[in-house]
């Protein structure tokens, strides 16, 4: 059965609008755990636009479940991750001008670099993942890197302008899940998933985790963080294993 990992970046986005201390993404993460989330994910960006270094430290010290750290493949971020020791590191592309991560990491052509980059994490027991498109070339390259997981980008599916394109994107993701599994990779899905479109993956085997943030934070503004997380947990818990 897939599990829910909650991204609390946008709680930090709201906090940073006033450069204040609230709302606190660490508190939100604890509430998510109490509501049934099986892990927390944060993206420590190079420009520190939402999550801050202190947030990562506090989350690592206080979470009862798991911390997944999204980050760019830079020397600075590698040092932070090796010091904090999250349960998983997920490498993502990063552009300063983007509002949110716009697409998957290009792995093909960078296999040697990424192999060397993730090696120190494996040596101390940190799981590794690459946020990639559901493209066969990228999935095969990810397998050559030797990561334990891939997270397939669902943003193009979520943003599809019509039913035909949405089906095309879903079919590509489902095929990508199958290919990744045959290559020995564990598969997570994330980006743009919400309380409605997640049902398109209800009967798809082989999904380990759904990484969901924005839609949960959006609902939480109206219903509270605990109920918003619980609603998503209840949906995912109905999915077959």
Curated annotation (Swiss-Prot):
Any matching Pfam family: PdxJ
EC number: 2.6.99.2
Keyword Cytoplasm: yes
UniProt site positions, description: Transition state stabilizer: 151
Location, primary (coarse class): cytoplasm
Active site residues per record: 43 (proton acceptor), 70 (proton acceptor), 191 (proton donor)
Localization (cell): Cytoplasm
Reported function: Catalyzes the complicated ring closure reaction between the two acyclic compounds 1-deoxy-D-xylulose-5-phosphate (DXP) and 3-amino-2-oxopropyl phosphate (1-amino-acetone-3-phosphate or AAP) to form pyridoxine 5'-phosphate (PNP) and inorganic phosphate.
Summary of subunit composition and partner proteins: Homooctamer; tetramer of dimers.
UniProt-listed HAMAP family: PdxJ (MF_00279)
Name of the protein: Pyridoxine 5'-phosphate synthase
Higher taxonomy: Bacteria, Pseudomonadati, Thermodesulfobacteriota, Desulfovibrionia, Desulfovibrionales
